[in-house]
A protein has these predicted regions:
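Extracellular glycan-interacting surfaces
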Residues: 1-209
Length: 209
């Protein structure tokens, strides 16, 4: 099993056993660690994508691909467990990818990438090409979304797909709102039952599970 860790953004791991490979996202790339079996000592296998600020890593279990979202670097793909990478972001017109997710539609795999400024992109060919889903930008209340640090732009920090229905996705905007789509990302609505009207500035959503 491969496990992923990052200082920012979202991680999706592959498998349910104790990991023997660990991908650790950093401000200067991804560090690889391996061990022969659970409980054994970890061995440093070096760093890949050196110089890239990696904020999010995902292992897609059906085909085993790994996707990494970069701050100011777009999206990268690995097909060999994280040792070599290629850029896969054609169609992603926003360079900062904060979150990545997948949905299984039978044998098909839909991939999602959340960005800054806050938007959502979808791929139906395993990351080779992407199409922006305009619904996030059309969400009511978007004008209140912001972020404390310059350039004060909100981002899609986290997302999760309903295991019962791959068209149902929840996304958290930092700082903004909790969003839901029931059509695979085309249209989104705000979920605000959990908060009070005066609390909108505190909707600093880091994780949706």
């Amino acid at each position: 099993m491969i496990a992923c860790l990052s200082p920012n953004g979202q991680n999706l791991n592959g498998g349910d056993a104790a990991p023997t490979r660990l991908l650790v996202a950093t401000l200067r790339g991804i560090n690889l660690l391996e061990r022969s079996e659970p409980g054994a000592a970890w061995t440093d296998r070096g760093r890949v994508l050196d110089g890239h600020h990696c904020g999010s890593i995902m292992v897609e279990p059906k085909r085993g691909g790994i996707f990494a979202g970069m701050h100011s670097g777009g999206l990268y793909f690995s097909g060999d467990g994280g040792f070599t990478w290629e850029k896969r972001g054609e169609g992603i017109t926003i360079g900062q990818v904060f979150s990545v997710g997948y949905a299984h539609h039978g044998d098909k795999v839909a991939l999602y990438a959340g960005t800054e400024p806050a938007s959502m992109f979808r791929s139906d060919d395993y990351g080779k090409s992407w199409v922006e889903q305009p619904g996030v930008k059309e969400t009511t209340g978007r004008d209140k979304w912001s972020f404390p640090s310059p350039p004060h732009q909100a981002h899609v920090k986290t997302m999760t797909i309903d295991p019962r229905d791959p068209n149902v996705i929840y996304a958290g905007v930092e700082q903004g709102d909790l969003l839901k789509t029931i059509d695979g990302g085309a249209r989104w609505r705000v979920l605000d039952d959990y908060s009070k009207p005066a609390d909108w500035t505190y909707r600093d959503i880091h994780l949706v599970v």
